[in-house]
């Protein structure tokens, strides 16, 4: 990978990362901007916090992130979750934040605030989630990583969960991300190479309620930061390449306590599916940008305009896994969300539709 343009010289940085920083801690404050991108900046703390409550509220220039006008540009960062920092190590931390305007209301980009209200209202039903984040890797030239220059690899077929040179690309990058997530405390549950070469997937969950969005956003942050070091750009576009190539989704596995209960689980799952069918277009509206390029009824997707459900059917809007159908309880998989979906929005609307009946 020496031909890539990396932004970090490990050999130069390592001696400085090894320096003693005493009791002081670097806290990387992380937030989501107006376009669904990720931003961050660093604060020095006198000592390691014992909880989120020990962290200071901070602010940033919202006019530079399209989150506020220039004449009233301060946007406030309220810490909501702490993770270990795999880049700096030691007691240094990553701090996920919500964005608030100066009048105390959630910023227009803050979908977490609404999601938290939804999850609090539905907490007795114990909503669990597991999200499957697909993404595509691009090199410094804007080419799909590992693909022939000015050409294409062989047709799809040997790449899904593939092993061997020419079938799998950037496995070292993928492994680095996996380990970084584990170190940080993110509930990453697995990885696999996807159908299109240089397309990968990681899974996060099971997570309860608001925790799902927090952990997926932090996993995305680590993916982008590690990409800086490799000179690789991970893309969450749901259809990064035209033609006979699979798109990228964020399949959303979801259950409530009733769905997981033997004897009545399948009835609860079927009831949820009926509710989801009635709200199909409302869900599509918040399931990610450019999803129409992906949900074509081809390449293991359902039609964007038609709702469908079935056991073990990867061409359906909602899939009931085979083992769930056999045992009669478990969870459902919503296959409609695009890879760039905001996890707070998808988890919130699933609960609103199936539990709160909104």
From Swiss-Prot:
InterPro entries the UniProt entry points to: Gln_synt_N, Gln_synt_N_sf, Gln_synth/guanido_kin_cat_dom, Gln_synth_cat_dom, Gln_synth_gly_rich_site, Gln_synth_N_conserv_site, Glutamine_Synthetase
Keyword Manganese listed: no
Annotated SMART domains: Gln-synt_C (SM01230)
GS beta-grasp domain boundaries: 25-104
Highest taxon of source: Eukaryota
Pfam families for this protein: Gln-synt_C, Gln-synt_N
Keywords: ATP-binding, Cytoplasm, Ligase, Nucleotide-binding
First-level EC class: ligase
EC number: 6.3.1.2
Molecular function via GO: ATP binding; glutamine synthetase activity
ATP-binding found in the keyword field: yes
Domain GS catalytic intervals: 111-358
Recorded catalytic activity of this chain's protein: L-glutamate + NH4(+) + ATP = L-glutamine + ADP + phosphate + H(+)
GO CC terms: cytoplasm
Location(s), subcellular: Cytoplasm
GO biological process assignments: glutamine biosynthetic process
Oligomeric and partner information: Homooctamer.
Entry similarity comment: Belongs to the glutamine synthetase family.
Protein name in the entry: Glutamine synthetase
Organism field: Cryptococcus neoformans var. neoformans serotype D (strain JEC21 / ATCC MYA-565) (Filobasidiella neoformans)
